[in-house]
From Swiss-Prot:
Expressing tissues: Expressed by the venom duct.
Record protein name field: Conotoxin Vc6.10
Species of origin: Conus victoriae (Queen Victoria cone)
Primary location group: secreted
Localization in the cell: Secreted
C-alpha cells in the first residue's frame, strides 16, 4: 500500500511538471483554433447580405438582384 502511494505521488509530480513545461502549448492551440474558425465567420450564410467585402460561403451564390446569399 505504501509503494502504491509513493507511485501515485511520483506520477502526480511528473504530470504537473510536464504541464508546466508545455504551458505555451495552450496559446498555440488557441491560435490554431482561431485560425480554423475564422474562415467560417468571413463568409455569409443563406439569405445573408453579401458583397465583395462580405462574400457568401462557397456553397452559396451572391444574387446580383437582391445582394443576398442563396
Amino acid at each position: 500500500m505504501e509503494k502504491l502511494t509513493i507511485l501515485l505521488l511520483v506520477a502526480a509530480v511528473l504530470t504537473s511538471t510536464q504541464a508546466l513545461i508545455q504551458g505555451g502549448a495552450d496559446e498555440r492551440q488557441k491560435a490554431k483554433i482561431n485560425f480554423l474558425s475564422r474562415s467560417d465567420r468571413e463568409c455569409r450564410g443563406y439569405n445573408a447580405p453579401c458583397s465583395a467585402g462580405a462574400p457568401c460561403c462557397s456553397w452559396w451564390t451572391c444574387s446580383t438582384q437582391t445582394s443576398r446569399c442563396f
